[in-house]
Amino acid sequence: MEDKKKRMAIIASKGTLDMAYPPLILASTAAAMDVEVGIFFTLYGVDIVNKKKIRSLKVAPIANPAMPSPIPFPNILGVLPGMTSMATMMMKGMIKKINWPTIPELVDICKEAGVRMIACTPTMEMTGVEKEDLIEGVEVAGAAEFLDFALDANINLFI
């Protein structure tokens, strides 16, 4: 009897720099372990695969109290002008220091590993994103298409 290949389904709903890493790292790692992987990018998660936004994802320090900082500051200071830029710059510095790939590099790694990437049609309609705005290789489909994949998954994650 032939073993069925393991499958992992991920929903990526956040489009910030810090929240783009978990689905892409998990997907690329699972694919390297010979797991069939699909990521459904919905709501702000579509920004991760949007050519116009992929290189400018940001980190919002407000409501992110666990964010490491060389200088501790109260969470309320996150509302001040320039704090998002500062937090983004700090995170990019930490990422570079530990030699992690950038988000565009991770997306390429996922594509090369055969990770199926699906952008949510209703989200695209709601936000005015066109198929041409997406990076090459991203499918466009609704929830039913993703659920068809996810219903047979061994692991389902919502990030």
Segment roles from a protein language model:
Residues 10-20, 49, 94-98:
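Short, glycine-rich nucleotide/cofactor-binding loops
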Residues 21-33, 39:
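Histidine-anchored nucleotide/phosphate-binding helix
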Residues 31-32, 111, 150-151:
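Anion (oxyanion) recognition and catalysis
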Residues 37-43, 118-121:
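Short internal beta-strands
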Residues 45-58:
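N-terminal beta-loop-helix "entrance" segment that forms/cooperates
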Residues 57-92, 99:
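A glycine-rich helix N-cap at a beta->alpha junction
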Residues 83-117:
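Alpha-helix-centered segments that form part of catalytic cores
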Residues 95-96, 119, 124, 132-159:
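Glycine-rich, aromatic-bearing surface loops/beta-hairpins
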